[in-house]
């Protein structure tokens, strides 16, 4: 078989972005399905918390294992494998009738979701010139907002009328996209030209924690943990929080859809600023905005304040995610880039395990949401401190 022709940056962004969109759509739909299962299966907050956390356990395992595999067999192959993993798993989960079976499948789906994100960002970052790399990666991450919007629309129109099973079957259709990727997507040119492909996975893991890279690895691991801990604690529970505050399921879905709309301007503003002010400082500013919004969302005592804080939370938090995905691969050379991105993202997914567990546990004990969201506020501020102390600027640096 002949070598595939190079792909334009715009087409690569669209191709990888669609994979990112499907990933976000699955995660977004899960937040609405948790709320639906709360009603249909009469789940308690203690049971609800495990759905999001098991998903994050799978994402942690997937981010680490598929990151290692991407440095061994290539970015493209792993991108396709992870896409098939979560799309087929979602389709099968539409037919389960017990929480235990649903949880097992959410672990498998989570592995695909967790593996796809760092591999896709690595693939794109290696194909873009330094002057545009940060902006393109943030724009790649903006597909996450479109996926969440699609999830909110599907949940609003499909779940109340046709059930949560129909929503999951729709996400399974993304498996067909893998067939397109197999023939249209070339692998990373930097990976293809790499002479160190025969390095063992263990050698790559050791290199990530070697003296030369331990500072960015520790910094990114802490930041990813705090950001993902807060994100999944807050966003997976948004529809359920609205339900627990007394709104109907339809009202809850409407309000979360409104909040989700703010994600796109958050991404676009970060994409515009990242090549002007740099990764480090834009990340700090957007995380501070996230912390403040989380605090006011938790303490809101009126619908208008709740929606305003929710919109700002979406704007700042998802903008920060975009910058973090641009910032992470730039810390490592090509030989260990996917391993480094996957390893630090795996620490983040561990945070994603504890976030939903924390909310479910505290909500079951009738702890106020002002206290719960204050905890997330503090976690985000810890990430800010870590970046300020240990982070370096990587704006427009040439990738090794």
UniProtKB/Swiss-Prot annotation:
InterPro entries recorded: MFS, MFS_dom, MFS_trans_sf, Sugar_transporter_CS
First-listed, main subcellular location of the protein, grouped into a coarse class: membrane
Pfam families, per the entry: MFS_1
Keywords associated with the record: Cell membrane, Membrane, Transmembrane, Transmembrane helix, Transport
Topological domain ranges for the Cytoplasmic compartment: 1-14, 71-77, 120-142, 187-217, 275-280, 326-343, 392-400
Ranges annotated as spanning the membrane: 15-35, 50-70, 78-98, 99-119, 143-163, 166-186, 218-238, 254-274, 281-301, 305-325, 344-364, 371-391
GO molecular function: transmembrane transporter activity
Topology of this chain in the membrane: Multi-pass membrane protein
Cell compartment(s), UniProt: Cell membrane
Domain of life the protein comes from: Bacteria
Extracellular topological segments: 36-49, 164-165, 239-253, 302-304, 365-370
A single cellular component GO annotation: plasma membrane
Disruption phenotype: Partially reduces sensitivity to the toxic niacin analog 6-amino-nicotinamide.
Function: Probably involved in the uptake of amidated and deamidated forms of niacin. Increases the growth rate of E.coli that is unable to make niacin de novo; confers increased sensitivity to the toxic niacin analog 6-amino-nicotinamide to wild-type E.coli. There is probably another mechanism for niacin uptake.
PANTHER family: CARBOXYLIC ACID TRANSPORTER PROTEIN HOMOLOG
Family listed: Belongs to the major facilitator superfamily. Sugar transporter (TC 2.A.1.1) family.
Protein name: Putative niacin/nicotinamide transporter NiaP
Highest classification ranks of the organism: Bacteria, Bacillati, Bacillota, Bacilli, Bacillales
């Amino acid at each position: 078989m002949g070598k595939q022709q190079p792909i334009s940056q715009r087409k690569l962004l669209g191709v990888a972005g669609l994979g990112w969109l499907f990933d976000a759509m699955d995660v977004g739909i899960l937040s609405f399905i948790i709320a639906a299962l709360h009603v249909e299966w009469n789940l308690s907050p203690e049971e609800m918390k495990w759905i999001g956390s098991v998903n994050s356990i799978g994402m942690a395992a997937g981010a680490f294992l598929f990151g290692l595999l991407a440095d061994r067999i290539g970015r493209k192959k792993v991108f396709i494998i992870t896409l098939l993993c979560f799309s087929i798993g979602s389709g099968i989960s539409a037919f389960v009738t017990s929480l235990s079976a649903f949880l097992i499948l959410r672990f498998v789906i989570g592995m695909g979701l967790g593996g796809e994100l760092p591999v896709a960002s690595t693939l794109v970052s290696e194909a873009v010139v330094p002057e545009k790399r940060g902006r393109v990666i943030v724009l790649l991450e903006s597909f996450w907002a479109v996926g969440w919007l699609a999830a909110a629309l599907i949940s609003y129109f499909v779940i109340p009328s046709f059930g949560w099973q129909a929503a999951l079957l729709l996400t399974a259709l993304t498996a067909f996209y893998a067939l397109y990727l197999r023939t249209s997507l070339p692998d990373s040119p930097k990976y293809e030209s790499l002479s160190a492909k025969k390095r063992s996975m263990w050698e790559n893991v050791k290199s990530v924690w070697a003296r030369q890279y331990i500072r960015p690895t520790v910094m990114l691991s802490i930041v990813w943990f705090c950001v993902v801990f807060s994100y999944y604690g807050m966003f997976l529970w948004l529809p359920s929080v609205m339900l627990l505050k007394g709104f109907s399921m339809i009202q809850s879905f409407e309000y979360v859809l409104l909040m989700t709309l703010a994600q796109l301007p958050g991404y676009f503003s970060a994409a515009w600023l990242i090549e002007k002010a740099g990764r480090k400082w834009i990340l700090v500013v957007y995380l501070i905005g996230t912390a403040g919004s989380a605090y006011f969302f938790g303490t809101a005592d009126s619908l208008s304040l709740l929606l305003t804080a929710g919109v700002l939370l979406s704007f700042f938090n998802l903008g920060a995610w975009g910058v973090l995905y641009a910032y992470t691969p730039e810390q490592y050379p090509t030989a260990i880039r996917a391993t480094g991105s996957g390893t630090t993202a795996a620490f983040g997914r561990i945070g994603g395990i504890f976030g939903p567990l924390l909310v479910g546990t505290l909500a079951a004990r009738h702890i106020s949401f002002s206290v719960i969201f204050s905890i997330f506020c503090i976690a985000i501020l810890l990430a800010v401190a870590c970046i300020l102390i240990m982070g370096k600027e990587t704006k427009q640096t040439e990738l090794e």
